[in-house]
Amino acid sequence: MSPLSDSKRSIVALALIFCSGGSFLFAQEQSATPASDQRDLFERAVAQAESTAAISHQLKDIFQRTAKAVVKIHGVDEHSEICGTGFFIDPTGTLYTAYTVGGEAGNFTIEFGGKKYPARQLLADIRSGTAMLKIDAATPTLSIGKSEELGVASPVVAIGYPLDLPETPNCGMVAGFDQKYLGRYFSTTHLRVNLPTQRGEAGAPLLNMKGEVVGIVVSRLENTSACYAVPIEAAEKIRSDFVRFGEARHGWVGINVSEAAQPVEGSRAEMTQIMDDTPAARSGIKPGDILLQVGRKRVTQPEDVLNASFFITAGDTVPIIVMRGDQRMIFHVQATLHPASRTGVMVASPATPLNQAIPLSLGSEVPRTP
């Protein structure tokens, strides 16, 4: 973006001085300020004006490029009408949304491009808190980014349909990466974002400053101006399962971990139980082994096992790296289907953080926790 012209710089800078520093002008009458100080004030005002203009331009560009791929979703469940947000992820009409929007409702209608389309559910996964719907139309798409590149204070943008209003951008920043909430564990690390959300914004895409999707808004924190978003990698894992198998296949190896007394190779995740007749038991992993890595995910504390385990797919062989004494060992374990996937029970005791999930409701009076 080209810099502001000298005349515009002066106008904007003076406007800022008048708006935010009226007392300064009054003080000028009381005591003279050196010309160098006046110049410094002017330059700071100019820099602030240029920075504000640049941010405004960037946000406007992101909204204009991405809003056309963000849609309003209507559905009906056994209690009431559901209204939420979704976004297209391929040019053939496939879209992501939150489980609270597309998971348990039916008779979906998508508002897109000034028209309404019937939609069908492809997949609903309560563990990730996401759902996939599809319409029969050619559609724009959003680019997929990497939530792993975000840090605390990274700026983000959500685009949704709050309170049945037109598409609306909402700007905030990443406040944290949480593995649990109120003592209960998420199935995978969630992004806590300083974004106030309203009814209708569940399923909204969370975008980085490149306009790439890095998360999906799935829940709001009551009595706060914050929300949770599931990382886009979690939704992509579920999508990959669907492409391969037609369903989500959450893997499981059958281990319990707790915090070791001392770190070993940077990890405090100690195997405390190897469940009988499980992939881990058959592989040779033993209690007392210190877990270093599951698949591609590094483990440094017991809670990391939740995030690593989420990305295991049943039927796949997963490399698991451990320390046994002073020996580094690699086990290739073929994961089986997670017991919760068979029983439908997705939330376990807070004392045993084993692949729990909290599909918190957002803007809905109907409890969604199973």
Predicted regions and their residues:
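Bacterial N-terminal signal peptides that target proteins for export
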Residues: 2-12
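Bacterial N-terminal signal peptides
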Residues: 13-23
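C-terminal recognition in membrane/secretory proteostasis and scaffolding
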Residues: 23-39, 61, 96, 114-121, ...
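N-terminal activation segment of mature serine protease catalytic domains
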Residues: 28-88, 94-99, 107, 130, ...
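Active-site region of chymotrypsin-like
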Residues: 69, 76, 131-143, 168-225, ...
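Conserved active-site neighborhood of the chymotrypsin/trypsin-like protease fold
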Residues: 72-83, 88-168, 190, 196-199, ...
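Short, glycine-anchored, charge-dense loop/turn motifs used at functional sites
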Residues: 92-94, 209-213, 288
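Short, conserved catalytic or interaction motifs in soluble domains
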Residues: 161, 179, 204, 276, ...
